[in-house]
Amino acid sequence: MSKKPVMLCIMDGFGWTPNKTYGNAVAAANKPFIDSLMAKYPMTTIDASGMAVGLPDGQMGNSEVGHTNMGAGRIVYQQLTLITKSIREGEMLKNPVLVKNMKAAIDAGKAIHLMGLVGTGGVHSHADHWFGVLEMAKHMGAKEVYLHCITDGRDTDPHSGKGFLADLQAKLDELGVGKIASVSGRYYAMDRDNNWDREEKAYAAFVYGEGEQYANAAEAIEASYANDKTDEFVLPCVTCEGGRMQDGDTVIFMNFRPDRARQMTRIFCDDAFTGFERRGGRKQVHYVCMAEYDATMPNCEVAYPPVELKNVLGQYLSENGKTQLRIAETEKYAHVTFFFNGGVEAPYAGEDRCVIPSPKVATYDLQPEMSAPEVAAECKQRIESGKYDVIILNFANCDMVGHTGVFEAAVKAVEAVDAAVKEVVTAVLDAGGCAFLTADHGNAEKMKNPDGTPFTAHTTNVVPFVAIGCGDVKLREGGCLADIAPTMLPYIGLPVPAEMTGKSIIVE
């Protein structure tokens, strides 16, 4: 017998704001199907940033955090918040993994290297954590500390790297410890789509001291801007002598978000790595991950291991004999699987996964439809198979194209999502099921700064929540992403487990 599926359709980066004109690609797009859903079915908006998703007040949401909260059915306090708290309360100074690995380098007369994204974006890393680890290194008596700075320009303004590097240099001057040894744009150092040629350039700067040589980081970033290369695309370069990573050194990867830290970590830690040839083989360093990037990764230690989440939606469905499909293109596949399952890599019994390859283009403004048509077509087939009780689906376009800062491309991205949503929602309704349409955070609804320059980061805006085919129900205001799973479960025919402290968005 065919199942009547319950679908959660996540339009990644589709935020909602009263500003319907300036720089709002969501409002500017021709999206007749999504508009019709919002007019016909019950709709509200829900919070997807700040304390509502376990981040500091005013901190924009992101895909990892959003999917974790949606899958958990409770507010999950994020690594950003937990690490910041440990610094403020003096707990970082006692962190056993950091203490042990810093001490190993100091006692052997070797260097400590901090590597990671710089700035206050708060999506992958945070300046406060850099400052905390630097203060700890000084406290422990470290003499040789080198910083390998990855510039952002996606989760922060494309020219904000200059200021972030200056802030970091000011901290080094204040402490009297540390030098910025290299600068690299995240396009090279934080790829997540197996573009090993990019990562090799960053690795060569870190380990071999290869790339353009500059007197300091300020000179490097100015040269990059002069060459029309914004923060994301800074070519890996070297900014001081003697800062190469060598055997016996300690390397601390400052990023707490896993997806864009895994590839570089694999280069350093995996003996079986074959993405490119590591001259002299794997570097014999003491490697510390600020958070867990991959539970199976060898030759590294985790400073802040994940908090185990019990009875997340995927686990709960599986234990109650329900079948589920997770489907997305490459860019968001980890989000509908690993993050949605609370950081668990392996699928649960009855959980099928489907990844559609993301297009191989330099930047997604060149192909704003991305792989949405293919994701929708595959999802429609799977719905029609009658096999699944629950479908978790992500369309990546509004976020990934939003990050390019190209307004016209973002409009096309929204329009591509509209066509894709039409295909899958129609299929679910035809199968007698229901769907919940939402987003994990904002992005495409703000593509321009007030001065007209591109805005490439996420936003703190609310996101839409539409209950489609759920009957004539009322939706409350003031909900958040953690409330989605408890809203879905009655339609799946299951009670809400005690661990899910979120509250249904549907008013009884």
PLM region spans:
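Feature captures the catalytic ectodomains and active-site-proximal regions of enzymes
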Residues: 1-508
